[in-house]
């Protein structure tokens, strides 16, 4: 992503930027047998899509979600939630007889989470499988930005993943920018080498990488941030935001390398979607003309608010106030 002074690109082209996030939304259950359970929906890229939509005026940025769902009532409720949040579902694939995946979240006294998943037969695994996916794959090139995570890659069949990567290559060749959040979950991959191969294929197409240090260390094992930045530079990634939890975020971009301190939170309730919300705020700021330093501050501010609430999606009334300075630079699309 290149930063220039001047007006935002959507103003110059008289249309909003089109952004699509690719991944999986699941049925979320929270609680325990003793106290009971509550049900909602979640998923890393879906969480990011919702927060991106909340932070982006519809006149500037159109946010869509790309996945596959079934014909059951939970799938219908998911799509209604997305629409209510301003997230478009026009490119959601509907598969007869399929259904969403499901997961349980349990949190300890420090707000750290334990997940139990049932997703092996989820509709999202088939998003890019078969000839029925051809139109969806072609539509990826219609977007200005495509956002994916490591989970977006992991949940797909091997055939679907390769079809997606081929479509991403075509889209990027036609001018689409790629944003990648590494979110590495070892249990979703047959082995680490398969994950490294898929990540490498996508990183070679990536313009902006939003990286969680712990996940990256687990997969690639870089000794320090310097080694990570060098490796991502070799992949051709022009902007990297390295998320390190409560520590400062480290940025590598065309302006050099620098750090942006995190906001301190006295009482953490639930860390679910902390990284997803950071990524959403960072991207929202960049797409509206903010520089990487301001984008990281937006990310820290939203993440700090999210971890003080239970669940991935906080109430709209709890969203922090985030604003761009009038002299902000613009992201060149």
Residue ranges of predicted features:
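Conserved phosphate/ATP/ADP-binding segment of small-molecule kinases
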Residues: 174, 184-257
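Active-site metal-binding loops of divalent metal-dependent hydrolases
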Residues: 25, 182, 277
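Conserved phosphate-binding/catalytic region of the ribokinase-like
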Residues: 2-17, 221-333
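Structural motif
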Residues: 18-20, 144-145, 208
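Conserved N-terminal subdomain of the carbohydrate kinase-like
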Residues: 60-151, 323-333
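Active-site glycine- and acidic-residue-rich loops that bind
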Residues: 124-125, 153-162, 186-193, 219
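Glycine-rich phosphate/adenosyl-contacting loop at the front of the ribokinase-like
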Residues: 1-87, 333
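Short, electropositive alpha-helical surface patch
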Residues: 74-87, 171-172, 195-206, 228-229, ...
């Amino acid at each position: 992503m290149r930063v220039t002074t001047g007006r935002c690109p959507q103003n110059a082209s008289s249309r909003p930027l089109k952004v699509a996030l690719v991944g999986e939304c699941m049925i979320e259950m929270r609680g325990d047998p003793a106290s009971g359970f509550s049900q909602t929906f979640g998923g890393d890229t879906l969480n990011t899509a919702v927060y991106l939509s909340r932070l982006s005026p519809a006149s500037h940025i159109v946010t869509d979600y790309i996945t596959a769902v079934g014909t059951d009532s939970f799938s219908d409720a998911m799509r209604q939630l997305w629409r209510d949040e301003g997230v478009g579902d026009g490119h959601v694939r509907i598969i007869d007889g399929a259904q969403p995946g499901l997961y349980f979240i349990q949190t300890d006294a420090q707000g750290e989470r334990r997940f139990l998943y049932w997703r092996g037969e989820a509709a999202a695994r088939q998003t890019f499988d078969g000839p029925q996916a051809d139109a969806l794959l072609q539509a990826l090139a219609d977007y200005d930005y495509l956002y994916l995570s490591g989970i977006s890659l992991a949940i797909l069949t091997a055939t679907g993943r390769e079809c997606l990567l081929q479509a991403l290559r075509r889209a990027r060749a036609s001018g689409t920018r790629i944003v990648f959040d590494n979110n590495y979950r070892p249990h979703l991959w047959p082995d680490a080498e398969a994950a490294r191969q898929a990540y490498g294929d996508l990183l070679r197409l990536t313009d902006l990488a939003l990286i969680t240090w712990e996940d990256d260390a687990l997969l690639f094992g870089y000794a320090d941030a310097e080694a990570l930045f060098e490796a991502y530079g070799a992949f051709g990634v022009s902007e990297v935001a390295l998320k390190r939890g409560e520590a400062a975020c480290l940025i590598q971009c065309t302006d050099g390398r620098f750090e942006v301190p995190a906001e301190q939170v006295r009482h953490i309730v639930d860390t679910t979607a902390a990284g997803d919300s950071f990524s959403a705020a960072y991207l929202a700021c960049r797409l509206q003309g903010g520089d990487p330093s301001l984008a990281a501050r937006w990310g820290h501010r939203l993440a700090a608010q999210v971890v003080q609430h239970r669940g991935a999606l906080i109430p709209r009334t709890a969203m922090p106030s985030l604003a761009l300075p009038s002299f902000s630079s613009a992201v060149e699309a």
